[in-house]
């Protein structure tokens, strides 16, 4: 009885592992094949990455950070075709017509813009030229230049906006400071201007700005800090400060500006 059972156990023992091996052999081979396939895919994925990095010219240093070469300077920058229309008030049409021969050369020669005066719409039209215009901010500079002239500034003062980048124009009204009407408004404007414009000229010379009095509107052209100093002097005159006190403050302001510059 022992021998047959032993033989059966051996057969079962031999048969059992053979079935498992038979069932597991393909799986083991598939696993091996899968491993090989996965390795091949990884290698194929890494190869394009390396080729992309090599094509892009990325060089890694010792710490693994990329090293980039110096950027190449572009000789010319492309500017999109844009246009701008600046309206001209009726009272500035005659000065614009008389000074037109001096207005368009800086726009055409310096900023490389196309300019024309539209008499029907009473606007100055500016347009960039894709081939000749190189400065992206040329159109804005030209519009600011024309706008300054239409506000009442002299031509030389307006051209300064094209040459200097730190010049601004600030506009405010007398009623923004204090609500005045009738004779009170006229007296406030007279205090700002002074006799024969002496007070206005004193503020301009002390703060290195340019001021235009257009009815109840006040336009100030200059640097940021200079505009603030001129605005403080004008506001104090509107509020009723005597001109003598304002002159004293202007002297201190002028001395500070001399120390700075």
UniProtKB/Swiss-Prot annotation:
GO biological process, one term: ribosome biogenesis
InterPro entries for this protein: KH-I_PNO1_first (IPR055212), KH_dom (IPR004087), KH_dom_type_1_sf (IPR036612), KH_PNO1_2nd (IPR055211)
GO molecular function, one term: RNA binding
Main location: cytoplasm
Cross-referenced CDD domains: KH-I_PNO1_rpt1 (cd22391), KH-I_PNO1_rpt2 (cd22392)
This protein's GO CC annotations: cytoplasm; nucleolus
Domain KH as annotated: residue spans: 182-234
SMART domains the UniProt entry points to: KH
Region span, Disordered: 1-29
Source species, domain of life: Eukaryota
Keyword annotations: Cytoplasm, Nucleus, Ribosome biogenesis, RNA-binding
Annotated localization: Cytoplasm; Nucleus, Nucleolus
Keyword Transcription annotated: no
Family statement: Belongs to the PNO1 family.
Purpose of the protein: Required for small ribosomal subunit (SSU) synthesis. Has a role in the processing of early nucleolar and late cytoplasmic pre-RNA species.
Subunit structure: Component of the small ribosomal subunit, ribosomal RNA processing complex (SSU RRP complex).
Classification via PANTHER family: RIBONUCLEASE Y (PTHR12826), RNA-BINDING PROTEIN PNO1 (PTHR12826:SF13)
Protein known as: Pre-rRNA-processing protein PNO1
